[in-house]
């Protein structure tokens, strides 16, 4: 579930995070450092709730108790607060595209799920990541998706890591 990084491991993680933040800044992403606790309204607004409520860490209460809009949860992904920065806004075409990156620790209870698709993976309840969030006009979403793929590939290529791209059905 949880782990310590010490010495070289801790330095390596910090270096990789900084490297990715620098690369994405070069790619035109604006950095955001969002809050770690988020409210239920934000979780619902990004599709995390009700589907993933059992995977979330609630602050000050159990997941089996009813929750209201103001209850707080540990961040499952930076997408929740970053997209909710615009929850009350109308984004006009001239404001787009908007490209944000956010480094955050993330918390999920799903660590116990195992199966053939997770063979060889170690699942944990807390992990760090640099998230990319893009807002574009609907007609540009496919092009932006391919742009995101290229931006992720650039990180892997600059690190000299081998990779492959899989096209998978999610529906």
Residues of each region from the PLM?
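TRNA-recognition modules of translation machinery and tRNA-sensing kinases, especially anticodon-binding
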Residues: 1-171
